[in-house]
Structures are given as C-alpha cells and as structure tokens.
Amino acid sequence: MSSTTSTAAGAAAGTDTIVDLRGMWIGLVVLNVFYLIVRIYEQIYGWRAGLDSFAPEFQTYWLSILWTEIPLELVSGIALAGYLWKTRDRNVDAVAPREEMRRLVVLVQWLTVYGIAIYWGASFFTEQDGTWHMTVIRDTDFTPSHIIEFYMSYPIYSVIAVGAFFYAKTRIPYFAHGYSLAFLIVAIGPFMIIPNVGLNEWGHTFWFMEELFVAPLHWGFVFFGWMALGVFGVVLQILGRIHALIGKEGVALLA
C-alpha cells in the first residue's frame, strides 16, 4: 500500500513541474530540421527546376508545394486557435499560483519558438530572396524563393503567433482580461508582412528594382518585421506577473 502511495505521489510531483522545457526543445528541433531540409531542397531544385515557370518541372517541384502549403497553413492556424479556445480554462481567475507560474513558463517557450521562426522567415529566407533576385531574372511572382519565403515561412511563424496569443488569452489570468498592446504588436505586426507582399508584388509589375532592395517599396517588410521587438514588452509583463506570484520573499532569494 505504501509503495502504491509513494508511486502516485511521485507521478503527481512529475506533473506538477513548473519548468519543463521538453515542448520547446521538440518544437525547435522540428522547426530547424524542417527548414534545413527545405534549404537543401531549394539548393537542389532551385537551379534545376526553378528558372523557367513555364517548364513542366517547375509545376512539379515548385507549384505543387505552393498549392499544398497555403491551404495546409490556413487550416493549421484555424485548427490551433480552435483547439486552444475549445480547451480553454473556464475559470481562469481561480488558477493556483503554482499552475499560473507553470503556464507563464510555457508561454515563454511559445515565444522562443516564435522568435526562431521569425528569424528563419523574416531574416534568413528574406535575405536569401534578395540575393536570388539579384542573381536570377524572374518570369513570375511565384519564384522558388518566394514560394518558400512568402508562402511558407511567413505563415508558419504567423501560426505560431496565433498559438502563443491564444494560449496566453485562454490560460493566463493576466492576459485573459483585455488585450495586451505589446502582445498584439508582436503577434499582428510580423503577420502584416503577408498583406505587404501583395503591395510589393504589385509594385514590381511597374518598377524594376531587384537590385534596389532598400527601395521604398520594400520598407513595409522592415516596418512590420521590427514589430517583433514588441516581445520585450510582453516579457516585461510576464516578469511583472512572476514578481507578483513569488512575492517579496522570492525576489529576495533571487537577489
């Protein structure tokens, strides 16, 4: 009997861990390995099948990705938001301090994965796109670089932003009431790069500026991309809540 009791107690303690980073590490590994595979695919088929949009191989190796990723990302974003809303805490104001602390740690993990996803999309693949267009004369708006950058990496980090926002909104008391301006900026700002893509491609039909990547037409990418810095405001809000949860005694122990 005592053995059974101790086993149950150990299991309860295991599920009561405040800092469990396994979810974050799994997310980071999956994300980075996926993008490394994508980059290798680009290297191989960008030159072999990505230079002529009228060629059959372009349809096979590139447009097939485009027609698959767009609905998949849309469904994933809606499904994630729906799941987080459906499983929301119906009595979030009554959550225990220890559980709230655990949820804050989970939120930080969401934001970490989001930050890495933004790096891949708004930095790595975006800079790569500039290099591509300074090297290759395109005959379509749906270049291999764009199919990966605009229609894969941007929606992926936007889906993660949806997850982070809905997680905070449905499970953490501090964010459940009202809306955090910093959180709205960090979630919506980088997403707005996607509508900006429409303006960008429209502009390219009138002005040739592949070699002028700093042209005003491209400023929207920078403006909305830098809104990701709103994450510092969210982190300050999280730290303020942690300070309130651990109290003066906890702060003194950490000082």
Region spans (language model):
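Perimembrane loop-to-helix junctions flanking transmembrane segments
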Residues: 45-64
